[in-house]
Amino acid sequence: MAFNDLLLQVGGVGRFQQIQVTLVVLPLLLMASHNTLQNFTAAIPAHHCRPPADTNLSRDTELEAWLPRDGQGRPASCLRFTSPQRGPPFPNGTGTNGTGTTEPCTNGWIYDPGTFPSTIVTEWDLVCSRRALRQLAQSLYMVGVLLGAMIFGYLANRLGRRKVLILNYLQTAVSGTCAAFAPNFPVYCAFRLLSGMSLAGISLSCMTLNVEWMPIHTRACVGTLIGYVYSLGQFLLAGVAYAVPRWRHLQMLVSVPFFAFFIYSWFFIESARWYSSSGRLDLTLKALQRVAWINGKREEGASLSMEVLRASLNKELTMDKGQASAMELLRCPVLRRLFLCLSLLWFATSFAYYGLVMDLQGFGVSIYLIQVIFGAVDLPAKLVGFLVINTMGRRPAQMASLLLAGICILINGVVPQDQSIVRTALAVLGKGCLAASFNCIFLYTGELYPTMIRQTGLGMGSTLARVGSIVSPLVSMTAELYPSMPLFIYGAVPVAASAATALLPETLGQPLPDTVQDVESRRKRQRRRQKQQQEQQKQMVPLQASA
């Protein structure tokens, strides 16, 4: 009897699985909000230099006198005249023709309070020469996500999924709330970094805890459900940000609920598969019996014993318990191949994804509308991805999603700038494909790695994804060399990465591997199957020729 049979014996997808999966994925609604929160909390409203305070002129006259105009006739954002220019006679009785010298803003800025009455940009003047600090805040958040993926991926293998998840909920609640009260920009960045760390841990432990409590035939459904909840969170962010335009209130609103998640997470049941892989057979038995009781399978739970578990989980009990570090991924050729290929897939997906979703103001339409559209496209994209995952397999779904996303982005690079509808449609389609790719890669990675390094593998994959999200904003700076250069790079990377899926095995309908030997055996079985198919094809060729 394998572990999957034990899950079926205690109820399969019963009341426990339904309740725990719901409670575990609920925080993902707000995790999506945190990842793209800076689209709203760091939005840049229209702005211009503040004229000198002692001019005694009306506002319109001040703008005419002190501010040069850009190519579209609007007041310049970052420059002002060194002395008052054209217009009616000024207090000193002079007037000029508007050709005076300019200088950077020296008295601060005036911001248009219409759409964004309060953001970190308006509060700390992150414009003009300080504009790069806005991107720094998002990059530091992604650095936190990278650190969290490495640290909490390792801790989840050593301490368990449940303990790490509880810690991450508390850290997100505290750091997110403190960020809302940050007195200055450095303190804000520090708390955002801590939030990124904990949210990475939540993402990894959420997927692993759910997958390890679900039977084989339902794992794809759970992975797709998690993806849909994340997409729903993007809808939620658009509505909440529209209703709560002030950044401190918005930051608070998406952080305080994690205190509630922290409280109810104490009632989660630790993964019995992790217990068994850690050699804690007594706790494995207690966890399975508790789940059987919740699922109404008391007799089946009572029939379980230490002897039954020893016979059923012999492989897990004989595994090497001491190795769960990242170096284990490079220890043998089969794991090394998995690690390198999956790392490329994680990097490419995140790199292209954040290249699109973190520049919503660049579309020239309502930022709230674009946020809703980007969330809406995930629904059909992930549905199609789910159907492909369950019918054709994980490998073709992963390859197709990355390839199509890259092609859409590359085409967007050659579409004229004035074709805004076409460019937006291609960006939305590409974003949908990347969302489907994220959905698949989480599930695919969890199914490829053996139990004792599964969380480490997910952590390292997420680490490479975060590297992609950190590098992505830097690539946008190449637009100064050529406007479409970022799109060409964002598109070429996923197209190239899609080829790596050809080196990965298919996991559709396969049990989760518990040991490295299981991974090697799976690869040998697939090689034998491919060899048999090739021999059958060779045998069919002479028959067709003779016919």
Curated annotation (Swiss-Prot):
- Compartments, as annotated in UniProt: Basolateral cell membrane; Basal cell membrane
**Locations of Basic residues compositional bias?**
522-531
Q: What is its main location?
A: membrane
Protein name according to UniProt: Solute carrier family 22 member 6
Further details from the record: Involved in the renal transport of a variety of drugs with well-known nephrotoxic potential, therefore may play a role in the etiology of the drug-associated nephrotoxicity. Uptakes the diagnostic agent PAH/para-aminohippurate and clinically used drugs. Mediates the bidirectional transport of PAH/para-aminohippurate.
**Gene3D superfamilies in alphabetical order:** MFS general substrate transporter like domains (1.20.1250.20)
Q: Which UniProt keywords apply?
A: Cell membrane, Glycoprotein, Membrane, Transmembrane, Transmembrane helix
Domain comment from the record reads as follows:
Multiple cysteine residues are necessary for proper targeting to the plasma membrane.
What is the membrane topology noted in the UniProt record heading this document? Multi-pass membrane protein
The gene it comes from is SLC22A6
What does its PTM field state? Glycosylated. Glycosylation is necessary for proper targeting of the transporter to the plasma membrane.
One GO MF term: prostaglandin transmembrane transporter activity
Q: Which residues get glycosylated?
A: 39, 56, 92
Spell out the reaction equation it catalyses: (6R)-L-erythro-5,6,7,8-tetrahydrobiopterin(out) + a dicarboxylate(in) = (6R)-L-erythro-5,6,7,8-tetrahydrobiopterin(in) + a dicarboxylate(out); L-erythro-7,8-dihydrobiopterin(out) + a dicarboxylate(in) = L-erythro-7,8-dihydrobiopterin(in) + a dicarboxylate(out); L-sepiapterin(out) + a dicarboxylate(in) = L-sepiapterin(in) + a dicarboxylate(out); prostaglandin F2alpha(out) + a dicarboxylate(in) = prostaglandin F2alpha(in) + a dicarboxylate(out)
Q: Which residues form the signal peptide?
A: none
Cytoplasmic topological domain ranges are: 1-9, 157-164, 217-224, 270-337, 390-395, 445-456, 506-547
List the Pfam families hit by this protein, alphabetically.
Answer: Sugar_tr
User: Residues on the Extracellular side?
Assistant: 31-135, 186-195, 246-248, 359-368, 417-423, 478-484
